[in-house]
């Protein structure tokens, strides 16, 4: 069962990405001109997406994949172009609709289903692979690990995901963000060190069935995120 904290943060994220930041997110994930700061975020996200996809087989034909927190669908579409049958889920109806439009505009025959919903939803089905790029970073470490636990029950081979690394800059941004009125601020990120995350994964029992694999940090301007790989033993 989702905690009260998880549900409250989920609602906050949905409101922010579906209303407050939908236009900005649409621009960020396109080729549209953006500010210098957002250009660094775009480059960082591109590098992270490449990292996560490179941790999966180059040929995904015959494989199933869930993109948990798909946003505007860039990663889901790239996975489908490599042959995967993809289910992509996001809390924001606005971003999901944009993802569907971008898929149609490609005019390619790709097996992607975009769904509005919660990545913890057990009714989404079972998959060979799960990708959660920057979709856990707004939850505290306990809720993030519980989300991985829920997803793990449905995943046969591998999960790749990101978390916000605990750095002095991110800690300062996290503290400063809380000074703004709630209506004016984005959902805060929840930085965590790799060591603390590893302890939580072990305490949750995930490491009994899953092997902690590769780990890689992307640090480009204002984009800072850390990728981790879990492979079923």
Predicted regions located by residue number:
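N-terminal, positively charged/glycine-rich alpha-helical extensions of SAM-dependent methyltransferases
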Residues: 1-31
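Class I SAM-dependent methyltransferase SAM/SAH-binding core
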Residues: 66, 74-116
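Conserved glycine-rich SAM-binding loop
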Residues: 71
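A conserved beta-strand element that flanks and buttresses the S-adenosyl-L-methionine
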Residues: 131
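A short, conserved alpha-helix within the catalytic core of class I
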Residues: 139-150
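Short alpha-helix
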Residues: 188-206
């Amino acid at each position: 069962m989702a905690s009260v904290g998880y549900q409250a943060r989920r609602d906050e994220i949905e409101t922010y990405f579906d209303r407050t930041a939908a236009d900005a997110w649409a621009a960020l994930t396109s080729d549209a001109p953006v500010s210098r700061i957002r250009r660094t975020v775009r480059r960082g996200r591109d590098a992270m997406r490449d990292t996560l996809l490179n941790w999966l087989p180059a040929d995904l034909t015959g494989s199933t994949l869930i993109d948990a927190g798909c946003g505007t669908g860039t990663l889901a579409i790239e996975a489908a172009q490599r042959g995967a049958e993809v289910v992509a889920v996001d809390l924001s109806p606005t971003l999901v609709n944009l993802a569907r439009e971008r898929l149609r505009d490609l005019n390619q025959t790709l097996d992607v289903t975009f769904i509005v919903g919660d990545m913890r939803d057990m009714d989404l089905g079972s998959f060979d692979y799960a990708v959660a790029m920057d979709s856990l970073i707004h939850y505290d470490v306990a809720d993030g690990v519980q989300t991985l636990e829920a997803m793990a029950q449905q995943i046969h081979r591998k999960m790749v995901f990101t978390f916000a690394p605990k750095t002095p800059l991110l800690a300062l941004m996290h503290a400063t963000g809380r000074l703004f009125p709630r209506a004016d601020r984005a959902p805060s990120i929840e930085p965590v060190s790799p060591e603390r995350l590893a302890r939580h994964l072990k305490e949750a029992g995930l490491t009994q069935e899953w092997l902690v694999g590769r780990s890689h940090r992307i640090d480009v301007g204002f984009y800072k995120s850390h990728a981790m790989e879990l492979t079923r033993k």
